[in-house]
């Protein structure tokens, strides 16, 4: 599995960092800006990119719609790779190669990429200004965006994605109306990800919202704390659904437990499938596990299609994540353990407190402004 290969590569890299720690400190290079130093001169170019996007893309380092969409871009660009197609003599996509921007006139017309044309338009000027590759920028912006969310792990960034040469084929990005079997088959083909690692990837929905799933309403979060990288998503997806936040009958959605909150059909199914339910539940009130697993799987995702041994580790450019500023997981006001649809057969659902007060609607997240 690609997952196992990455683990081995990271283990070797960590060993080398430990054994060579003192020499590396002496070999740091001074960056041209006169402010920063780096372990590799190639990383210096990314400090100005960081300053620029933190101020002008993420509005001073906020965990808002732009951060959510930057993370979405990483998934939709990276997962578009198929060794299965390659084995049939067809082009299977380049993975994390920036093709969703390079060939945006093609790939943003694919159904699962609806709405990403606006994100592409927002990100393109930054790429042109700094002269970096599209694939590297997507991965970098995604890592920085996540780091702006309290509770996020220390994100990693590896440099060295060449420009895409072809548009990725259609049909490689999972959709919310797909079955569990369809999603798992796609994830296994793309990166050797199994059902457990797929759950790790879905942790991204802790800081996500839907802008285009329901065309009648945008900015619908998938949990009640979209500005925090926490485990609340894994609590609320196990609550019994009671109503749709907007229009009923939207393909790929099911009833959610809270007003203003959207629940994707795939999230609902993963929380209840016997292959994934226990891993899903394991994140509840386990911030350390959430951070460690997402840090790892983001790196695996954002390097799909590339040899990590040929890439440069520039993780030092990614800022330290904002610290946890929230308490343990909880039941939203008006909800209790009785509202949980228990699916993990081997482990009881954790004991949680219920938030005080009357039940309230989850606030919408304003979408990113349209580019000029």
Curated annotation (Swiss-Prot):
Positions contributing to Ca(2+) 2 binding: 206, 223, 225, 228, 230
Reactions the enzyme catalyzes: 1-(3,4-dimethoxyphenyl)-2-(2-methoxyphenoxy)propane-1,3-diol + H2O2 = 3,4-dimethoxybenzaldehyde + guaiacol + glycolaldehyde + H2O; 2 (3,4-dimethoxyphenyl)methanol + H2O2 = 2 (3,4-dimethoxyphenyl)methanol radical + 2 H2O
UniProt pH dependence: Optimum pH is 2.3.
Name under which the protein is recorded: Ligninase H2
Active-site residue numbers: 76 (proton acceptor)
Cofactor note: Binds 1 heme b (iron(II)-protoporphyrin IX) group per subunit.
Family: Belongs to the peroxidase family. Ligninase subfamily.
Function: Depolymerization of lignin. Catalyzes the C(alpha)-C(beta) cleavage of the propyl side chains of lignin.
Co-factor(s): heme b; Ca(2+)
Glycosylation sites: 286
Residues the UniProt record annotates as site (Transition state stabilizer): 72
Pathway this chain belongs to: Secondary metabolite metabolism; lignin degradation
Domain of life, per lineage: Eukaryota
Disulfide bonds: 31-44, 43-314, 63-149, 278-344
Swiss-Prot/TrEMBL keywords: Calcium, Cleavage on pair of basic residues, Disulfide bond, Glycoprotein, Heme, Hydrogen peroxide, Iron, Lignin degradation, Metal-binding, Oxidoreductase, Peroxidase, Signal, Zymogen
